[in-house]
UniProtKB/Swiss-Prot annotation:
Ca(2+) 1 binds at S19, E22, D24. It is found in: Cytoplasm; Nucleus; Secreted. The lineage of its organism: Eukaryota, Metazoa, Chordata, Craniata, Vertebrata. This is Protein S100-B. Zn(2+) binds at H16, H26, H86, H91.
Amino acid sequence: MSELEKAMVALIDVFHQYSGREGDKHKLKKSELKELINNELSHFLEEIKEQEVVDKVMETLDEDGDGECDFQEFMAFVAMVTTACHEFFEHE
């Protein structure tokens, strides 16, 4: 398996490690999203402590307005963070 394919499998696995703990296994609730960000993105993003921050992140990601983050919305978030990191490291 190529490095890109391994990364794709890892993204799917991480999403499903957190989704469905509290309901729909194909979507992240706010608490699941907060836990995922704090556990899996701690080197790129600050720890989320305030509920308002979680609410704002979810509002930004939740394109269909259902109050949860599906895999497509999660991938859009990963792409945004990855792009920001790439731009940051590109200038170093």
